[in-house]
Amino acid sequence: MSEPIESLTVDAVLDATGLFCPEPVMMLHQKVRDLPPSGLLKVIATDPSTCRDIPKFCVFLGHELVAEQAEESTFLYWIRKKSD
């Protein structure tokens, strides 16, 4: 990633705090659908399985995982929707 996380301007935020598999990824799928092409989504999650599931989601569907960060028991992801 070329720019610092703090400088990223997100188009939407998905707060999946307190939710467990498969809910965060199901919500992510719907939220990404609502984004414009190349839109940036920030995901906040507390389920450790998102460390595996969200990167795989991005690879499988062609979205870019711009950044990911763990802060204690909170996991943050910045996902750029693929351009159509």
From Swiss-Prot:
<dbReference type="Pfam" id="PF01206">
    <property type="entry name" value="TusA"/>
</dbReference>
<protein>
    <recommendedName>
        <fullName>Sulfur carrier protein TusA</fullName>
    </recommendedName>
</protein>
<dbReference type="InterPro" id="IPR036868">
    <property type="entry name" value="TusA-like_sf"/>
</dbReference>
<comment type="similarity">
    <text>Belongs to the sulfur carrier protein TusA family.</text>
</comment>
<feature type="active site" description="Cysteine persulfide intermediate">
    <location>
        <position position="21"/>
    </location>
</feature>
<dbReference type="GO" id="GO:0097163">
    <property type="term" value="F:sulfur carrier activity"/>
</dbReference>
<dbReference type="InterPro" id="IPR022931">
    <property type="entry name" value="Sulphur_carrier_TusA"/>
</dbReference>
<dbReference type="GO" id="GO:0005737">
    <property type="term" value="C:cytoplasm"/>
</dbReference>
<dbReference type="GO" id="GO:0002143">
    <property type="term" value="P:tRNA wobble position uridine thiolation"/>
</dbReference>
<comment type="function">
    <text>Sulfur carrier protein which probably makes part of a sulfur-relay system.</text>
</comment>
<keyword id="KW-0963">Cytoplasm</keyword>
<dbReference type="InterPro" id="IPR001455">
    <property type="entry name" value="TusA-like"/>
</dbReference>
